[in-house]
Design a protein with these regions (language model features):
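Peptidoglycan-targeting cell-wall enzymes and recognition modules
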Residues: 1-15, 21, 32-108
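GGW-centered surface loops in extracellular recognition modules
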Residues: 24-25
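Acidic helix/loop microenvironments that form the catalytic cleft of cell-wall polysaccharide enzymes
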Residues: 34-38, 102, 110-135
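Short beta-strand->loop
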Residues: 55, 136-137
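A broad structural signal for alpha-helix termini and local helix breaks/kinks
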Residues: 18-19, 127
């Protein structure tokens, strides 16, 4: 598991480099996803599946984000990030970048940072889908 304070610092610094990427809500959302999906980086590869990284992003989702994310290529260029699905397993900045880019694709805005339950429900709806095993709890 990655030290939560160090991870939060890296998340904040990375999100601030992405145009419109940082807010207290987005910082919390990335950390919540990382805690839930990979236990803060304990699992960087799904034990029985294709998902990779702290956000457990599947290669098909990665590729869809690059193809359909309106700001993905432009933001990657600004951050000098090259597209490479394998980086999801070992590059924390790339993982944070991809989580944020995926969240940018949702038309519904992130809830306020002071409403953790609403952020958890938002992530359940937009990250795991209502049909997945995860709950907002």
């Amino acid at each position: 598991m990655i030290d939560p304070k160090q991870l939060r610092s890296l998340v904040k610094r990375t999100l601030k480099r992405i145009p419109h990427g940082h807010s207290d809500s987005s910082e919390i959302a990335v950390l919540m996803l990382s805690a839930h999906e990979s236990r803060l980086g304990k699992y960087l590869k799904q034990t029985q599946g294709p998902a990779l990284g702290m956000g457990q992003i599947e290669p098909i989702t990665h590729d869809d984000t690059w193809k359909h994310g309106y700001s993905c290529a432009a933001n990657a260029k600004l951050l000098r990030i090259d597209r490479d699905v394998e980086r999801l397993e070992y590059d924390l900045v790339y993982q944070i970048f991809m989580i944020r880019q995926r969240l940018f694709m949702k038309s519904e805005l992130l809830p306020p940072a002071n409403d953790l339950w609403a952020i958890a429900e938002y992530l359940k709806k937009h990250w795991n889908t209502v049909h997945g095993k995860a709950t907002a709890d």
